[in-house]
Protein backbone atom coordinates (compact mmCIF):
# COMPACT_ATOMS: atom_id res chain seq x y z
CA UNK A 1 0.00 0.00 0.00
CA UNK A 2 1.32 3.43 -0.95
CA UNK A 3 2.21 5.76 1.82
CA UNK A 4 0.66 9.26 2.13
CA UNK A 5 4.03 10.80 1.31
CA UNK A 6 4.21 8.98 -2.03
CA UNK A 7 0.69 10.15 -2.89
CA UNK A 8 1.63 13.74 -2.19
CA UNK A 9 4.61 13.35 -4.50
CA UNK A 10 2.44 12.07 -7.37
CA UNK A 11 -0.31 14.65 -7.10
CA UNK A 12 1.80 17.69 -8.17
CA UNK A 13 2.91 15.86 -11.32
CA UNK A 14 -0.64 14.87 -12.16
CA UNK A 15 -1.97 18.38 -11.60
CA UNK A 16 0.86 19.81 -13.69
CA UNK A 17 -0.01 17.49 -16.59
CA UNK A 18 -3.64 18.50 -16.35
CA UNK A 19 -2.74 22.20 -16.33
CA UNK A 20 -0.58 21.70 -19.43
CA UNK A 21 -3.29 19.75 -21.25
CA UNK A 22 -5.94 22.45 -20.75
CA UNK A 23 -4.26 25.13 -22.96
CA UNK A 24 -3.49 22.48 -25.58
CA UNK A 25 -7.13 21.39 -25.61
CA UNK A 26 -8.22 25.01 -25.95
CA UNK A 27 -5.86 25.53 -28.88
CA UNK A 28 -7.21 22.43 -30.63
CA UNK A 29 -10.78 23.58 -30.05
CA UNK A 30 -9.92 27.03 -31.42
CA UNK A 31 -8.27 25.49 -34.49
CA UNK A 32 -11.31 23.29 -35.14
CA UNK A 33 -13.59 26.32 -34.80
CA UNK A 34 -11.51 28.34 -37.27
CA UNK A 35 -11.42 25.44 -39.73
CA UNK A 36 -15.16 24.94 -39.41
CA UNK A 37 -15.81 28.63 -40.00
CA UNK A 38 -13.49 28.61 -43.02
CA UNK A 39 -15.24 25.61 -44.56
CA UNK A 40 -18.63 27.18 -43.90
CA UNK A 41 -17.52 30.38 -45.61
CA UNK A 42 -16.27 28.39 -48.57
CA UNK A 43 -19.54 26.46 -48.74
CA UNK A 44 -21.48 29.74 -48.81
CA UNK A 45 -19.49 31.11 -51.73
CA UNK A 46 -22.35 30.27 -54.07
CA UNK A 47 -24.34 33.04 -52.36
CA UNK A 48 -21.91 35.56 -53.88
CA UNK A 49 -22.95 34.57 -57.42
CA UNK A 50 -26.00 35.73 -59.38
CA UNK A 51 -28.93 33.43 -58.70
CA UNK A 52 -29.76 32.95 -62.38
CA UNK A 53 -26.18 32.05 -63.30
CA UNK A 54 -25.89 29.59 -60.44
CA UNK A 55 -29.25 28.02 -61.31
CA UNK A 56 -28.25 27.69 -64.96
CA UNK A 57 -24.98 26.03 -63.94
CA UNK A 58 -26.75 23.59 -61.62
CA UNK A 59 -29.32 22.60 -64.24
CA UNK A 60 -27.17 22.56 -67.37
CA UNK A 61 -23.83 21.13 -66.26
CA UNK A 62 -25.15 17.55 -65.81
CA UNK A 63 -26.74 17.72 -69.28
CA UNK A 64 -23.72 19.22 -71.06
CA UNK A 65 -21.27 16.82 -69.40
CA UNK A 66 -23.49 13.72 -69.68
CA UNK A 67 -23.19 13.41 -65.90
CA UNK A 68 -19.41 13.60 -66.08
CA UNK A 69 -18.88 11.21 -69.03
CA UNK A 70 -17.58 13.55 -71.73
CA UNK A 71 -16.29 12.98 -75.22
CA UNK A 72 -14.62 15.69 -77.31
CA UNK A 73 -17.84 17.42 -78.54
CA UNK A 74 -19.34 17.54 -75.04
CA UNK A 75 -16.07 18.90 -73.65
CA UNK A 76 -16.18 21.73 -76.18
CA UNK A 77 -19.83 22.45 -75.33
CA UNK A 78 -19.01 22.40 -71.62
CA UNK A 79 -16.17 24.89 -72.15
CA UNK A 80 -18.55 27.16 -74.07
CA UNK A 81 -21.13 26.88 -71.27
CA UNK A 82 -18.60 27.67 -68.54
CA UNK A 83 -17.28 30.61 -70.56
CA UNK A 84 -20.75 32.08 -71.05
CA UNK A 85 -21.60 31.65 -67.37
CA UNK A 86 -18.31 33.30 -66.40
CA UNK A 87 -19.14 36.26 -68.65
CA UNK A 88 -22.56 36.40 -67.01
CA UNK A 89 -20.95 36.60 -63.56
CA UNK A 90 -18.61 39.32 -64.78
CA UNK A 91 -21.31 41.48 -66.39
CA UNK A 92 -23.76 41.00 -63.52
CA UNK A 93 -21.35 42.86 -61.27
CA UNK A 94 -22.08 46.02 -63.28
CA UNK A 95 -25.86 45.74 -63.11
CA UNK A 96 -27.82 47.61 -60.49
CA UNK A 97 -31.38 48.37 -59.47
CA UNK A 98 -33.15 51.63 -58.75
CA UNK A 99 -36.50 52.41 -57.19
CA UNK A 100 -38.51 54.99 -59.11
CA UNK A 101 -41.19 57.37 -57.86
CA UNK A 102 -43.91 54.93 -58.92
CA UNK A 103 -42.60 52.45 -56.33
CA UNK A 104 -41.36 49.91 -58.86
CA UNK A 105 -37.82 48.58 -59.06
CA UNK A 106 -36.01 48.90 -62.39
CA UNK A 107 -32.72 47.40 -63.48
CA UNK A 108 -29.90 48.94 -65.43
CA UNK A 109 -26.27 48.74 -66.41
CA UNK A 110 -23.67 50.98 -64.78
CA UNK A 111 -21.77 53.34 -67.06
CA UNK A 112 -19.00 55.87 -66.57
CA UNK A 113 -21.51 58.70 -66.14
CA UNK A 114 -24.30 56.95 -64.29
CA UNK A 115 -26.59 54.08 -65.13
CA UNK A 116 -28.49 53.03 -68.22
CA UNK A 117 -31.92 51.80 -67.06
CA UNK A 118 -33.03 49.48 -69.83
CA UNK A 119 -36.54 48.57 -68.64
CA UNK A 120 -37.87 52.02 -67.65
CA UNK A 121 -40.91 53.08 -69.73
CA UNK A 122 -40.00 56.79 -69.94
CA UNK A 123 -36.95 57.33 -72.22
CA UNK A 124 -36.33 60.73 -70.60
CA UNK A 125 -35.93 59.10 -67.18
CA UNK A 126 -38.57 61.23 -65.46
CA UNK A 127 -39.32 59.87 -62.00
CA UNK A 128 -35.90 58.30 -61.51
CA UNK A 129 -33.48 59.43 -58.78
CA UNK A 130 -30.08 60.91 -59.53
CA UNK A 131 -28.30 58.19 -61.51
CA UNK A 132 -24.82 59.71 -61.33
CA UNK A 133 -24.15 57.95 -58.01
CA UNK A 134 -24.60 54.59 -59.77
CA UNK A 135 -21.62 55.09 -62.11
CA UNK A 136 -18.89 52.50 -62.48
CA UNK A 137 -16.19 52.51 -59.83
CA UNK A 138 -12.95 50.59 -59.33
CA UNK A 139 -14.63 48.37 -56.75
CA UNK A 140 -17.00 47.12 -59.46
CA UNK A 141 -14.07 45.77 -61.48
CA UNK A 142 -12.74 44.06 -58.35
CA UNK A 143 -16.10 42.43 -57.71
CA UNK A 144 -16.36 41.35 -61.35
CA UNK A 145 -13.00 39.57 -61.23
CA UNK A 146 -13.78 38.02 -57.84
CA UNK A 147 -17.14 36.77 -59.11
CA UNK A 148 -15.44 34.98 -62.00
CA UNK A 149 -12.91 33.43 -59.62
CA UNK A 150 -15.67 32.32 -57.25
CA UNK A 151 -17.57 30.77 -60.15
CA UNK A 152 -14.41 28.94 -61.17
CA UNK A 153 -14.01 27.63 -57.63
CA UNK A 154 -17.63 26.45 -57.57
CA UNK A 155 -17.23 24.79 -60.98
CA UNK A 156 -14.08 22.96 -59.89
CA UNK A 157 -15.96 21.61 -56.87
CA UNK A 158 -18.65 20.11 -59.10
CA UNK A 159 -18.03 16.41 -59.69
CA UNK A 160 -19.59 16.42 -63.17
CA UNK A 161 -17.44 19.31 -64.39
CA UNK A 162 -14.27 17.81 -62.94
CA UNK A 163 -15.01 14.31 -64.28
CA UNK A 164 -15.60 15.77 -67.72
CA UNK A 165 -12.05 17.10 -68.02
CA UNK A 166 -10.29 14.80 -65.54
CA UNK A 167 -12.04 11.41 -65.68
CA UNK A 168 -9.12 9.61 -64.00
CA UNK A 169 -6.87 12.24 -62.42
CA UNK A 170 -3.52 11.33 -60.95
CA UNK A 171 -2.97 11.68 -57.24
CA UNK A 172 -1.15 15.00 -57.57
CA UNK A 173 -3.80 16.39 -59.92
CA UNK A 174 -6.52 15.28 -57.53
CA UNK A 175 -4.82 17.11 -54.67
CA UNK A 176 -4.58 20.27 -56.76
CA UNK A 177 -8.26 20.02 -57.70
CA UNK A 178 -9.13 19.69 -54.02
CA UNK A 179 -6.87 22.46 -52.69
CA UNK A 180 -6.97 25.19 -55.34
CA UNK A 181 -10.77 25.76 -55.43
CA UNK A 182 -10.92 25.85 -51.65
CA UNK A 183 -8.02 28.28 -51.41
CA UNK A 184 -9.37 30.55 -54.14
CA UNK A 185 -12.83 30.45 -52.60
CA UNK A 186 -11.65 31.34 -49.11
CA UNK A 187 -9.45 34.20 -50.35
CA UNK A 188 -12.25 35.59 -52.51
CA UNK A 189 -14.69 35.29 -49.62
CA UNK A 190 -12.34 37.30 -47.41
CA UNK A 191 -11.93 39.95 -50.12
CA UNK A 192 -15.70 40.21 -50.45
CA UNK A 193 -15.84 40.90 -46.72
CA UNK A 194 -13.17 43.59 -47.04
CA UNK A 195 -14.78 45.09 -50.15
CA UNK A 196 -18.52 44.45 -49.70
CA UNK A 197 -20.78 44.72 -52.71
CA UNK A 198 -23.19 47.66 -52.67
CA UNK A 199 -24.92 47.03 -55.95
CA UNK A 200 -28.15 45.07 -56.14
CA UNK A 201 -28.25 44.02 -59.74
CA UNK A 202 -29.87 41.25 -61.71
CA UNK A 203 -29.80 38.04 -59.73
CA UNK A 204 -28.95 39.75 -56.44
CA UNK A 205 -31.29 40.78 -53.60
CA UNK A 206 -32.70 44.29 -53.73
CA UNK A 207 -32.41 46.54 -50.67
CA UNK A 208 -32.68 50.23 -49.99
CA UNK A 209 -30.17 52.88 -50.96
CA UNK A 210 -28.88 53.32 -47.44
CA UNK A 211 -25.53 51.68 -48.21
CA UNK A 212 -25.09 53.42 -51.54
CA UNK A 213 -21.93 55.41 -52.05
UniProtKB/Swiss-Prot annotation:
The gene is DMP3. It is a multi-pass membrane protein. The chain crosses the membrane at residues 45-65, 74-94, 136-156, 176-196. This is Protein DMP3. It comes from the Eukaryota. Keywords: Endoplasmic reticulum, Membrane, Transmembrane, Transmembrane helix. GO terms for cellular component: endoplasmic reticulum; endoplasmic reticulum membrane. Residues 1-27 are annotated as: Disordered. It is found in: Endoplasmic reticulum membrane. Belongs to the plant DMP1 protein family. It comes from Arabidopsis thaliana. Expressed in leaves, siliques and roots (e.g. root hairs).
Amino acid sequence: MSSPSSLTQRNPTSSQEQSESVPQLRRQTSQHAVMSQTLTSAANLANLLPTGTLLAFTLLIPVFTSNGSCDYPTQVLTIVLLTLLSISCFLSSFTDSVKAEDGNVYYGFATRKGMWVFDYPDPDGLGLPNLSKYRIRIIDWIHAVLSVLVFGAVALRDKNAVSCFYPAPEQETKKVLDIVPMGVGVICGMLFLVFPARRHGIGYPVTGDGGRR
